[in-house]
């Protein structure tokens, strides 16, 4: 079924039972060896609050888990986050409302841990600009701080997100855009630097002061900056990232 489900129809793998033996060795190997990083993994935590009488304090099914040693609910839920990160999950469903309430009230640090480290967190790690009259040469390096991937290669998205540089005038209006064809965000994995060299000429009619910015644009929406990059807010102009002021 894999060639049909994943390759032809473009479905993404989803797995519940993250943080338990229900996520089997065979399935883990399939994710590691066959699916990731080409396919983003949609993860769901275990449904631990499943006591038939509603009293979850006495029903601790996780204590019988065959993979992880867990003594209480806090340990069980923390294991879910660790397992989700180790499995490169793009998402982690906290499951039913009562369980979500426990997460938020008792383990906000673990919720934040997945927000910070799970999925994709893309950012330009280094940008060097060289200007020769109307020609700009940019050396730029990108990283993914998250354990997952931006599924830009999914058939429904069809590589619509692209690395683009723009020039803004003093009114913050975009007057020039260049898209780097060699940079592909779906390839960016945690722990690796992705380096590119971009060179382009600026139209002769542009003269004066301009702001050079970079962003991940959506080619289906008039190349507007579409992805929130993991960069300090004081460098942001909307979803664009400030690079340098230029005099043309």
Each model region followed by its residue ranges:
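Short amphipathic alpha-helical surface micro-motifs
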Residues: 73-75, 103-108, 179-181, 195
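Acidic, low-complexity intrinsically disordered regions
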Residues: 18, 43-44, 99, 138, ...
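Extracellular/luminal regions of secreted and cell-surface proteins that mediate adhesion/ECM remodeling
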Residues: 112-248
């Amino acid at each position: 079924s894999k060639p049909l489900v994943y390759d032809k129809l473009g479905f993404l793998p989803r797995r519940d039972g993250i943080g338990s033996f229900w996520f089997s060795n065979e399935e883990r190997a399939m994710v590691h060896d066959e699916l990731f990083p080409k396919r983003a993994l949609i993860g769901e935590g275990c449904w631990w609050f499943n006591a038939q009488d509603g009293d979850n304090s006495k029903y601790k099914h996780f204590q019988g888990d065959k993979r992880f040693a867990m003594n209480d609910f806090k340990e069980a839920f923390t294991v879910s986050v660790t397992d989700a990160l180790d499995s490169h999950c793009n998402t982690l469903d906290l499951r039913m409302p009562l369980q979500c309430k426990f997460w938020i009230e008792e383990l906000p640090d673990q919720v934040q841990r997945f927000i910070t480290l799970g999925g994709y967190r893309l950012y330009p790690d280094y940008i060097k600009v060289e200007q020769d009259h109307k020609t700009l040469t940019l050396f730029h390096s990108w990283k993914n701080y998250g354990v997952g991937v931006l599924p830009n290669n999914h058939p429904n998205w069809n590589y619509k997100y692209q690395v683009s540089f723009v020039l803004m005038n003093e009114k913050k209006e975009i007057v020039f855009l260049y898209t780097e064809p060699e940079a592909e965000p779906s390839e960016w994995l945690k722990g690796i630097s992705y380096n590119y060299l971009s060179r382009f000429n600026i139209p002769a009619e542009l003269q004066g002061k301009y702001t050079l910015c970079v962003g991940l644009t959506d080619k289906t929406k008039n190349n507007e900056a579409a992805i929130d990059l993991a960069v300090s807010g004081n460098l942001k102009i909307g979803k664009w990232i400030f690079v340098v002021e230029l005099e043309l």
